[in-house]
Amino acid sequence: MGSVNSRGHKAEAQVVMMGLDSAGKTTILYKLKGNQLVDTLPTVGFNVEPLEAPGHVSLTLWDIGGQTQLRATWKDYLEGIDLLVYVLDSTDEARLPEAVAELKEVLEDPNMAGVPFLVLANKQEAPGALPLLEIRNRLGLEGFQKHCWELRACSALTGQGLQEALQSLLHLLKSR
């Protein structure tokens, strides 16, 4: 779909955000879009927003609903994407195995061959949030050697870590 170049030309990229329901995908989308906190409802289907990123990169961000009944459709959004952003709730330790299983299933899809991904460990501002190192170990990210990836801590609520996440996203796009 899109391409990112280093010659100063405007580049475009398709970025899909996935994760379990209530992970914070929609809040992150709109916080990045306008630095605003919005009231959200569970996403049925998807939200899509353009975002002009630093370095003359035009992103199309797809926020895909994460409820159990919607996950069967996730594969429909993977064809031709440039990057996957996988959002997880750092406070929901009980659902971490489910989040890991869903991420693995997405990454095994043939459309994901060579596609980089960024994992956002959201809700880091909350008491009881799992530390980044523990999340990294539990996700088994080192096992995904066919993909370039990064893991970032963030808080959609406060905005902490989102600009760094955007920089990681751009770095991963350029690694393709």
From Swiss-Prot:
Q: Give one GO biological process term.
A: hematopoietic progenitor cell differentiation
Q: What does this protein do?
A: May play a role in apoptosis. May act as a tumor suppressor.
| UniProt-listed PANTHER family | ADP RIBOSYLATION FACTOR-RELATED (PTHR11711)
Sites binding GTP sit at: 19-26, 63-67, 122-125
Q: Which SUPFAM superfamilies match?
A: P-loop containing nucleoside triphosphate hydrolases
- Name the lineage: Eukaryota, Metazoa, Chordata, Craniata, Vertebrata
In the record, the note on similarity to other proteins reads: Belongs to the small GTPase superfamily. Arf family.
What keywords are assigned to this protein? GTP-binding, Lipoprotein, Myristate, Nucleotide-binding
Lipid modification (N-myristoyl glycine), residues: 2
Q: What name does this protein carry?
A: ADP-ribosylation factor-like protein 11
| A Gene Ontology molecular function term of the record | GTP binding
Q: Does the keyword Lipoprotein apply?
A: yes
Naturally occurring in which organism (per UniProt): Mus musculus (Mouse)
Annotated NCBIfam families: small_GTP
Which Pfam families has this protein been placed in?
Answer: Arf (PF00025)
